[in-house]
């Protein structure tokens, strides 16, 4: 699958206090409804829970460009309601919000257009090391339903890979890259969002 050079990837790490995951996802569901109706420039809007912490929400978002993310998506009323809740006096976050900017290196989002499912095995792995080595050694997995390699726009030494197997029982581990460190996170689709626009 090819992606336009302007495609902007946004990884969101939203770590809520105990019991906040449901409220955060409820607000994101309302944003998702708006995205589907009014944002053709939003190509992926996918939210999952951390497998070990249901109040840790992981987001994978793809936009036509960073400009439409900042000037259109983030200015919509449903998104502003969500953002205002995160910064409200209610203080729902256990840790500061992390928003990471990436570009696509290679890969595919939903090989057979099956759509996401809570039974999928999904692994998000960040690799830190020599940029040239990571670019050369990280490869797309043609057997995976999702295999997306992305490169940080903020830190040249940071790459990440999203791998998903659709209800197959396969549980892949991170790639072994010489001289690089890796941190992996298993996530479970929350029922909110999409990989490819329906």
Swiss-Prot record:
Question: Do you know which Gene3D superfamilies this protein is assigned to?
Answer: 3.30.70.100
Q: Which GO terms describe its molecular function?
A: oxidoreductase activity
Describe the location of the ABM domain by residue ranges: 8-102
InterPro entries per record: ABM_dom, Dimeric_a/b-barrel
* GO cellular component terms, semicolon-separated: cytosol; nucleus
SUPFAM superfamilies for this protein: Dimeric alpha+beta barrel (SSF54909)
Which parts pass through the membrane?
Answer: none
Can you say what this protein is called? Uncharacterized protein C21B10.08c
Tell me which species this is from.
Schizosaccharomyces pombe (strain 972 / ATCC 24843) (Fission yeast)
